[in-house]
Amino acid sequence: PMVNQVHQLSYSPLTAHAFNADRSKVAVSPNSSEICIFASTPQGWVLEHSLTGHDKVVTGLDWAPNTNRIVSCSQDRNAYVWTLSGATWKPTLVLLRLHRGATSVRWSPREDKFAVASSARIISVCSFEEDNDWWVAKHIKRPLRSTVTSIDWHPNNVLLAAGCADFHARVFSAYIKGVDTKPPPSVWGERLPFGTVCGEFPTPSAGWVHGVAFSPSGDALAFVGHDASLTIVYPSASQDSLPTMHVIRLPSLPYVSVMFISESALVAAGHDCQPMVFEGSAENGWRITRSL
């Protein structure tokens, strides 16, 4: 069995973290405007780089496994794309055109776009324009009615799930002409212009949505809410029939994050200080199986 290792990286809360492709390095934000990159050594985790560019608390980090680029977002309403050149991380400022702080950021599966959630009731979807040599942000606004707390990309590089403090999880199209190829039809729909709402699902008792995740196939969506609920949605391929939804009311404090580890298993964690494993399917429902 794998032995748990505990490492103290900071004496302050970590507001964001992201591992590189082989998990040999981790970027963290110690509740400040700084990004610290630690490398794994036989002696433990050693500080390798300190990245400065933001002027308020960094709220989101993601490390692209193939291009090795880091994207960061902050309460300062901006994002940076960090590229390793020799032994130096070089930042590129991305103007998100937000009037409130960013909350989360994620690279798309093909790493040619990233999405930034915010307190401005906006998701900024950013893509690179070769002609102008800069990152351009397009906004998803409606029907978001509050802070967007979490986002997750569909494997097809086009659909984007968002959890919001307006008690809903939604699936949007983030299709950008000239960047994306037309995705094949899926259970979420066929014609998907930018900003299309492909699904909208409430928490059972009006709880903020804290975390969203697509399954590996992208055919299921899970989200956790502040009403101590976990919901798994299987959309219907037919527009005439309703999606299958499995709602688990938890006898515990709320979860704040969720991720699938296979089509039939997911892990959720939150204020109970222990990750929990759930297993199930569309046909048989879902249940808690064990604690990690």
Regions found by a protein language model. Give the residues of each.
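Structural hallmark of WD40 beta-propellers
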Residues: 23-27, 67-71, 80-81, 91, ...
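Canonical WD40 repeat/beta-propeller blade segments in eukaryotic WD-repeat proteins
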Residues: 11-19, 56-63, 99-107, 145-153, ...
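Conserved strand-to-loop turn within each blade of WD40 beta-propeller repeats
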Residues: 29-32, 73-76, 117-120, 163-166, ...
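Short C-terminal beta-strands that terminate individual repeats in beta-propeller domains
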Residues: 4-9, 47-53, 73, 91-97, ...
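Intrinsically disordered, low-complexity acidic/Ser/Thr/Pro-rich linker and tail segments
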Residues: 1-36, 183-197, 292
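WD40-repeat beta-propellers
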Residues: 35-40, 79-84, 123-128, 169-174, ...
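Solenoidal tandem-repeat scaffolds enriched in leucines and small polar residues
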Residues: 95-185, 194, 211
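Terminal intrinsically disordered, low-complexity extensions flanking WD-repeat/beta-propeller proteins
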Residues: 147, 177-200, 243-292
